[in-house]
């Protein structure tokens, strides 16, 4: 795992998206990504306004929104991202051949490449998925974009481990600029070959151990000590009975303290 500070890594990173994110993390003292799966745009924007000061990254699933529109959802979302200084990660999990994912990324109702700083993909279809998504981004925007590969998942019974994970890492090596890291539960290495991948870890909780649908939670200290750079937290921030302000600061501090411990810095 990396023991360098976020700012040190930002200064040397090949990806402008990764460098921007790492600098935001250092500036805001946050490695918290909020995962907000809600059905209404108004609820999404309300939660983003409240949680914005505590996060470095917002993870969305815009296809869950029942009232999505570019003008009423994406425009205000981008304004909030600028106001609160966080990036946006649309958790699309692309998993098709290169030409198809290129169209899915750039076209249709959501036009993800136009507004999402980061997206992600499965490695099951091979390296063509990376090339297709990169080409799509270059065709529709001058803004830098980044891709995460899904190397490991937090759900019970996931098939993303072992040989599959190793194969996904090899696919990530096909593009040093566009692929910025992984969705993973552990460090994915690569530093000795010149890669500085960001590791983002879902299934992080300070209280619950899991849910009835197979999600398994690990502690903040556990995942950061194991190599995670960004903790992804969803219902722990805004579920019924939880105050997003209290939980946002609680998880931000827990994640930051764990990072300081890993790199040998004091608060």
From Swiss-Prot:
Molecular-function GO terms, alphabetical: orotidine-5'-phosphate decarboxylase activity
SUPFAM superfamilies recorded: Ribulose-phoshate binding barrel
Enzyme class: lyase
One Pfam family per UniProt: OMPdecase
GO biological process: one example: 'de novo' UMP biosynthetic process
Catalyzed reactions per annotation: orotidine 5'-phosphate + H(+) = UMP + CO2
Superkingdom, taxonomy of origin: Eukaryota
Pathway this chain belongs to: Pyrimidine metabolism; UMP biosynthesis via de novo pathway; UMP from orotate: step 2/2
Keywords linked to the UniProt accession: Decarboxylase, Lyase, Pyrimidine biosynthesis
One CC-aspect GO term: cytosol
Binding site for substrate: 37, 59-61, 91-100, 217, 235
Gene3D superfamilies tied to this protein: Aldolase class I
Family: Belongs to the OMP decarboxylase family.
Protein name per the record: Orotidine 5'-phosphate decarboxylase
């Amino acid at each position: 795992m990396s023991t360098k500070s976020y700012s040190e890594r930002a200064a040397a990173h090949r990806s402008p998206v990764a460098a921007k994110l790492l600098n935001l993390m250092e500036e805001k003292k946050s490695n918290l990504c909020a995962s907000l799966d809600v059905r209404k745009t108004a609820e999404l924007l309300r939660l983003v306004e409240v949680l914005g000061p505590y996060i470095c990254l917002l993870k969305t699933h815009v296809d869950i929104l029942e009232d999505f529109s570019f003008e009423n959802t994406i425009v205000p979302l981008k304004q909030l991202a600028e106001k609160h200084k966080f990036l946006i990660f649309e958790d699309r999990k692309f998993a098709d051949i290169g030409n198809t994912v290129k169209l899915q990324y750039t076209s249709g109702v959501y036009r993800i490449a136009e507004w999402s700083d980061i997206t992600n993909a499965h490695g099951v279809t091979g390296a063509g998925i990376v090339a297709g998504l990169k080409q799509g981004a270059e065709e529709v925007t001058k803004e830098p974009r980044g891709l995460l590969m899904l190397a490991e998942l937090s759900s019970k019974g996931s098939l993303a481990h072992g040989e599959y994970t190793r194969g996904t890492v090899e696919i990530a090596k096909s593009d040093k600029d566009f692929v910025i890291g992984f969705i993973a539960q552990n460090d994915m290495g690569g530093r000795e070959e010149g890669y500085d991948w960001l590791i983002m870890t879902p299934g992080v909780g300070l209280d619950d151990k899991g849910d009835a649908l197979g999600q398994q939670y690990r502690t903040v200290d556990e995942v950061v000590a194991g190599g995670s750079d960004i903790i992804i937290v969803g219902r722990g921030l805004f579920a019924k009975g939880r105050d997003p302000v209290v939980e946002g600061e609680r998880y931000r501090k827990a994640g930051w303290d764990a990072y300081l411990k890993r790199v040998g810095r004091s608060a």
